[in-house]
Amino acid sequence: MTQLPELGLRSPNNKSPTGPHPLEHLLARLLKRRRRSTLMSSPRSLLCSISGPGSHLLSTHPILCHSVYQPPQPASRPQAKRYQGLLPVPLAPHPLCLSGQLYLPNIPCTVIDGCGPVISHLKLTMYPWGLPPSHLGSSSPFSANMEQWDYYKSQTRFAPFLPESFCGSPLPSEQSSRPFGLAFKVLCAATCQPPQFQLLWLCPYKLDLHQRICLPPNLALVLLGALWTSPPPGSFLQPPYNRPYKLYKTN
């Protein structure tokens, strides 16, 4: 186990497990509970609800009750299909694809807690490396890409869309990249002394459906640790981008 001091997270430095992900059953239970909830349910019983384009967000983290979803102008967002539910992908699931292959985009919110307001968001996008398809089932060499950090800081109202996930599809080529994303919402509490960063949630997401499931921090860290591997030698990630869990203070 390797210690990641920035988040105090321990992660395996060996291969990720094959077969269904160990958190799939937990996500499935969240989905089942979420499907039984309706738009008419009490916000208190749901802990937190956010209405978006064709979506209804239910979070299990109490702090998210202070979240406010602010949709972008229609012209700034690509045309999205009007799905009302969570649709499984009919292809065979990839071991790293969670909860029956959900299409879950990343829709940021403004979050306030008892320590101070959010002043920055951080999006870490996990990309597949060019391994033969036979390796995808047993090895998962993903690494967070910090290159989108500067762009995302200016897009806190609405995260940029990424290409469709490669999950359940053939290995992507350089001409047709299909990244699988793990979006992290990070809180920078400016009023704390010293300023602190706090991981609020982790959202697996894909394109085409304005809906997401967000995990509380304890499950997020477990999932992150299960997926983490170091960048392969000679990868395009160069310092400081090969330190994906070092969170930089911003104004």
From Swiss-Prot:
Give me the ranges of the annotated region Disordered: 1-22
On the tree of life, the source organism's domain of life is: Eukaryota
Which protein are we looking at? Uncharacterized protein NDUFV1-DT
Q: Which organism is it from?
A: Homo sapiens (Human)
